[in-house]
């Protein structure tokens, strides 16, 4: 998968800086999981990925502390479902203010409500939408009918609005080769 050129250039600058500093090991991407709450119960996720309580989420200041301590130029927000994080707008704005590139891993069911019209498209944000196969397979894997169509509609709308959109697929035993 090819990432946007700006993401790639940022990574290259980070690696060059680390080399100049003589560091052999350093983080390049921070996987930030601010919550373990999800609106789906997919086959590929362990129970703690979708059964967490919203009240157990990390507050934005702890997220920012982790980001600042890590120093990676890219932050991948995943967990449960990031669009359920009540402080998502604050978190994204804080990451952009720190000049971070952000990958938001989402099932796309709440993009309309939580992102579109709330956080404008920017070259610093990449929406990574999970589509685990075509309609029948994806709906089976997510344990809910209609999720494929909702996710695909959200991906199309995000593109129309100017967001960077990538699709991510997990291949399961149930995935058909043709997909």
PLM regions with names:
Residues 82, 108-113, 127-144, 173-174:
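Conserved radical SAM core fold
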Residues 142-160:
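Glycine-rich S-adenosyl-L-methionine
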